[in-house]
Amino acid sequence: MTENRGTWCFWPATATIAGPSGGLPSGVALRQCAGNLPRKFEPQAHRTMKQAVIVGVQGVIGRYICDHLLKLGDWEVIGLSRRQPAETRPRLRHVSVDLLDRADAEAKLSGLTGITHIFYCAFQSRPTWAEHNAPNLAMLVNAVEPIANASMVLEHFNLIEGTKYYGSHLGPFKTPAKESDPPHMLPNFYYDQEQWLRTNQPASRWTWSALRPHAICGFALGNPMNLMTCLAVYAAISKELGLPLRFPCKPGTFDAIYQMTDSALLAKGMTWAATTPAAYNQVFNLTNGDFFRWRNVWPRIARAFDMEPGPVQTIKLTEFMTDKAPLWSAMQQKYGLEAHPYEQLVAWPFADYVWAGDWDIMSDMTKIRRAGFHEYVDSEDIILGMLAAFHHQRIIP
């Protein structure tokens, strides 16, 4: 660690963390660097290769499922997104496609004749909840139908939903939420997407599954709707200004029970659901498997930045942090950080939205455990490991 980058108290300076182009950070895995040696690949002749399409491959979910499948070695991967990736990735074929344009989808996807699995991680944001429905359903249909028509070997479609299905974004809801709980008062585009699958799958040769994570913890440059990068940049700027690390949202949020889903854990769950008969045509909650309160983890986060933990001071991050781009640029120069544009790292309205909920967020994991998925991670370790990775990747001082 270079002297002018400040003090980092969580991760040893000798640790080696792969950057985004060479493998993505994943909480607990970051604490097991010695175990992250490349797997010995078996001869291709001894395996049956599966071919996956990842819709939304450049997002915080898509990047991790892509990495996971490629590391397994018996998957070929085709990634879909609207924009060309800023980096090339070995063994990943990319297709740029506008899934809101059916003609473009047909033209780009009708040649994908060997696809066995589709992992759907795409999302189109709109100003109101009602406006989310049409574009997000259209993108799903425009991805599934051309590929299903082209590939006679399509086996499974995996969909990512979330706890907003239960109304976690609206206010207090029944906790712990179970998959059998009804959705909140519509509209909800998760409901529309799932109902389309339930309606159309019985006449198809493929199966489907849907997972409901919460507060996905990962990193994807150019996808600023990520609480971990917002937290990291907020803490780094607070330290640069000589401030304690105050919790910037409601007192109730500080004390409410919360949960997260590590992106690497989610990738494992997606692969399990796509290849396990017990998961076919089923919906599962998938979180880290534990719960926490921000009040309890906040001192550990402050220590990681060598800062004093401050009290709650409720502010709108959108109002107080948007003007910090010049300061961040100066910090990048001062500490030799990667020159990622401020607006590509953080979306303060998203952080305000996530931290606005001063009610418990809890999902029941019984169903997925009974079906055979038993992976779990420690959420506090995930948070601290992700922040350490940002430091070693020179994203923050």
Where are these regions (language model features)?
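Conserved Rossmann-fold NAD(P)-dependent oxidoreductase catalytic core, especially the SDR/UDP-sugar
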Residues: 118-120, 131-189, 209
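A conserved pocket-lining segment of Rossmann-fold NAD(P)-dependent short-chain dehydrogenase/reductase
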Residues: 233-261
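Mid/C-terminal beta-alpha module of Rossmann-like enzyme folds, strongest
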Residues: 266-351, 364-366, 370, 387-394
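Glycine/proline-rich active-site loop of Rossmann-fold NAD(P)-dependent oxidoreductases
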Residues: 204, 216-234, 264, 272-284, ...
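AMP-binding adenylation
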Residues: 1-41
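NAD(P)H-binding glycine-rich loop region in Rossmannoid oxidoreductase-like domains
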Residues: 85-88, 93-142
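N-terminal Rossmann NAD(P)H-binding glycine-rich loop of SDR-like oxidoreductase domains
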Residues: 52-72
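Active-site Tyr-X1-5-Lys
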Residues: 183-211
